[in-house]
Amino acid sequence: MGKNHFLKDFSALPEDVLIENERGITLLGYPLFSPKILLPHVDPPQFQRLNTENGSLIALSKNTISNFIELYPIDLSTERTAGSSSSQMTKWFVLMDYKEKYDIDDQGWCYSWNFNNSRWKSKNGLVRRRVWVRLPTTSHGLD
C-alpha cells in the first residue's frame, strides 16, 4: 500500500475510485506521457485503487485491468453496482475538479515533479495523475 499525497478530501467520493498514473518526457519541446515509461520500483503502477476508509493507495496489477475500450479502466460489460440486488450498470468517469479543490487540465490530469509530491497542478511536470470514479448510469430508453 502506498501513501496518498494526492487526494486530501475523499469523504464524499464514491466507493470505487481508481488513480491513473503516467510519466512524461519532453521530445523536441513537446511533452509525451505514457504509462510505459513509469520507472519500476520508483513510480507507482499505472493504476491504483483508493481505499476510501483510510485513504491509502493499493496497487493494481496489469492482470486486474482487463480492458481499455472507450478509455474506461475496467471492462464495463460485466461491471455491476457492488452489493446491490439490482443489476444496475455502472460506468467509469474521469473526476473533474472535485469540489473546486484541484487544479486540473481539460482531460482531468494533474501534474507534478514526482508522485510523492503534495502539490499538483494543471500543467508542467514530469508525472501526471487522474482520478476515475465508478458511478451508476440511468437508462433513458423508450419502452
Swiss-Prot record:
Compartments where found: Cytoplasm; Prospore membrane
Annotated InterPro entries: Peroxin/Ferlin
Signal peptide boundaries: none
UniProt GO BP: ascospore formation; ascospore wall assembly; ascospore-type prospore membrane formation
Cysteines engaged in disulfide bonds, as pairs: none
Keywords from the UniProt entry: Cytoplasm, Membrane, Sporulation
GO CC annotations, alphabetized: cytosol; prospore membrane
Topology versus the membrane: Peripheral membrane protein
Domain of life where this protein originates: Eukaryota
ATP-binding listed as a keyword: no
Subunit and interaction comment: Interacts with SPO71.
Family: Belongs to the SPO73 family.
Protein purpose: Required for spore wall assembly and ascus formation. Involved in the formation and elongation of prospore membranes.
Protein name listed in UniProt: Sporulation-specific protein 73
Organism, as annotated: Saccharomyces cerevisiae (strain ATCC 204508 / S288c)
